Regions:
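ABC-type ATPase nucleotide-binding domains, specifically the catalytic core motifs of the NBD
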Residues: 68-72, 90-92, 117-137, 149
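The feature captures the beta-strand-to-loop junction immediately N-terminal to the Walker
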Residues: 50-52
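ABC ATPase NBD coupling module
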Residues: 73-75, 86-102, 212, 250-254
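ABC ATPase "signature
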Residues: 244-245
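Conserved ABC ATPase signature
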Residues: 160-165, 169
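Conserved ABC ATPase "signature" region
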Residues: 79-86, 132-156
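Catalytic Walker B motif of ABC-type/P-loop ATPase nucleotide-binding domains
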Residues: 186-189
């Protein structure tokens, strides 16, 4: 039985929006990368963003924690609500937003310090030193590493340099680094692209383990991965949202011919 088959059935997770966009458009200079995207991503599920290169899926993912804004030539219109709050409201703190919406990148990017210091990096960053005790930090490290399945392997190596770990362990550690600040949403931009088959399988299994406690949104070019490792899929093309459905429905009975053409490998 697959790990997905052992996970909580989708109908057992209450339907509640985790991320909602309305008429979201984004320009890089004069180039429009997103065109009036309206989508509702369900809380507690795994949603894959799929489509050919340049379709806008990574741009959309990075809108959800406003990472795109680090580029000075970006303009955005429309609305994004995270847990029913518009993230473009004037009173929204980017620091608080990025605590709630963590991100994992294509290549593992552990800090060049110990495993222990990697895990508590965010907690130290967002807390006053006087508010943190050694026992609290120790507990946070154990809990986070347990959640990602690394505690048994690394509990005796917490002082080891994180960059010396295997790539799969590094990527799991990057996920663990998000957890002590209690995110609601975890964004993943092709998190398995640097991993081998076994590493990919391990990250996909971890995603199913985290599902329900967190909302996961993943960008992937791998159609088999999207089908194996997500509850719902959003298919994008040329900056537009073409189709958003439960994963099996989208793959078995796509409503839009463009979706069918992409799934069948006719372009992309």
């Amino acid at each position: 039985m697959s790990f997905a088959a052992r996970a909580t059935p989708i109908h057992a997770i209450p339907r509640e929006p985790g991320i909602t966009t309305r008429d979201l458009s984004l320009w890089y200079g004069d180039f429009q990368a997103l065109k009036n995207i309206t989508v509702e991503i369900q809380r507690g599920l795994i949603t894959s963003l799929i489509g050919p290169s340049g379709c806008g899926k990574t741009t959309l993912l990075r809108c959800f924690n406003r990472v795109n804004e680090r580029y000075g030539y970006v303009r955005t219109t429309g609305e994004i609500k995270i847990l029913k709050k518009n993230i473009y409201d004037a009173d929204v703190s980017l620091i608080e937003l990025r605590k709630s919406v963590g991100m994992v990148f294509q290549r593992p990017n552990p800090l060049p310090v110990s495993v222990y210091e990697n895990v508590i990096f965010g907690k130290r960053l967002h807390s006053e030193p006087k508010d943190l005790t050694k026992s609290e930090l120790d507990a946070a490290v154990e809990l986070a590493l347990t959640e990602v399945g690394l505690w048994n392997d690394l509990k005796d190596r917490l002082d080891a340099r994180a960059t010396e770990l295997q790539l799969e362990q590094q990527q799991k550690l990057c996920i663990a680094r998000l957890l002590p600040v209690k995110p609601e949403i975890i964004l993943m931009d092709e998190p398995c692209s640097a991993l081998d088959v076994e590493g990919t399988r391990a990250i996909e299994e971890l995603m199913w383990t985290l599902r329900g406690r967190y909302t996961l949104v993943i960008v992937t070019h791998n159609m088999a991965q999207a089908r194996r490792a997500s509850d719902e899929c959003v298919f994008m093309l040329l900056g537009e949202l073409v189709e958003h459905r439960r994963t099996e429905d989208l793959f078995l009975n796509p409503r839009d011919p463009r979706t069918a053409e992409y799934i069948e490998g006719r372009y992309g």
